[in-house]
Amino acid sequence: MKARMTALYAIGHFCIDLACAFFMFHCVRDSETWVTAALLYNFCAFALQMPLGLMADRLRRDRSFAVIGCVLVCLAALLRGSPLPLSILAGVGNAFYHVGGGVAVLHTYPERLGPLGLFVSPGAFGIFLGTLLGKGTLPMLPVCAVLLLMAGLLLVFAKGVRPPEMDMELRTAPLAAIGCLFLVVLLRSYLGFLFTFPWKTGAWAVIAACGVVLGKTAGGYVSDRIGMKQTALLSLGAAAILFLLSGNPICGILAIFFFNMSMPITLRAAADALPGLRGFSFGLLTFALCLGFLPAWSGLPAPSGGWFLALGAAVSLLLLLPGLGRKR
């Protein structure tokens, strides 16, 4: 039952991110308000997860949040002639789904990272595929139908585990460790916009997207086997070395794979640091994602070259280790 629930939430994550990317590129990309709409979407999709996560902690209705997310994104399709309202509604729906699904998996597997990595990983490929489809001629109706089907499946099959009552105070939280985790995610988000390798076209672009997905998945399951610190050392250390050779597509894809292995580690560590506020911890790190893409959207000049990505991976490791505290 737990495995089925996690698989459903993971598939839903793929569908919700695909739908949002599809709607944005199908309905908004060519409008005069594209830049504003994209900023509004990203703010709603990522920054709003923090207050929504706190709300989920209070209400303890994880599945309901995920279902609401599917419905809201579906309703956004009705606003195809209004780019800004569509972007806002799609972003809010995306935030609802991520909070609902993420917190449900955190509650269901309080000691494991593998299922968490499985949940977060499909979103990257959903965005990639949704962007491609959004630039084509696929009608919106099939996408909406899939979202409604997903909402129905979650209602029927994703029963989940009711979280235990726990302390929901911040005063006893290890704030320094949480701050380190926040900075790791912010840096990961920023560096992700610098993965503009000259070889990243055609089939190599598809393989690179798969590298993101598989890296996040592997990070969770490897951490369950050898521990979070060992996984962080191996993955980010390997990423730092391989980024120096990222002009070669094989080395670049391996670097992306290893770099993304830290994703479930940061989410699990933050949730463990705030055990009664898992929704808030999830949203706090997605707020860091939101801040991380602001430099790219603002048009600030970005450093180029594998050396900067290698430096970023090394700094991420130096921040992540104290963020993990005494965890093995």
Question: Where are the model-predicted features located?
Answer:
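Helix-loop boundary and gating motifs at the non-cytosolic
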Residues: 1-42, 184-200, 297
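Central cavity-lining transmembrane alpha-helices of secondary-active solute carriers
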Residues: 35-57, 206-219
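Glycine-rich segments within core transmembrane alpha-helices of 12-TM secondary carriers
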Residues: 45, 111-134, 279-299
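Conserved MFS/SLC helix-loop-helix module at the cytosolic interface between two early adjacent transmembrane helices
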Residues: 47-81
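Cytoplasmic membrane-interface "Motif A"-like loop-to-helix N-cap segments
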Residues: 57-70, 224-237, 277
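Intracellular juxtamembrane helix-capping segments at the cytosolic ends
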Residues: 94-110, 260-276
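Symmetry-related core transmembrane helices of the 12-TM Major Facilitator Superfamily/SLC fold
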Residues: 139-159, 305-325
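C-terminal transmembrane helical hairpin of 12-TM major facilitator-type secondary transporters
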Residues: 229-266
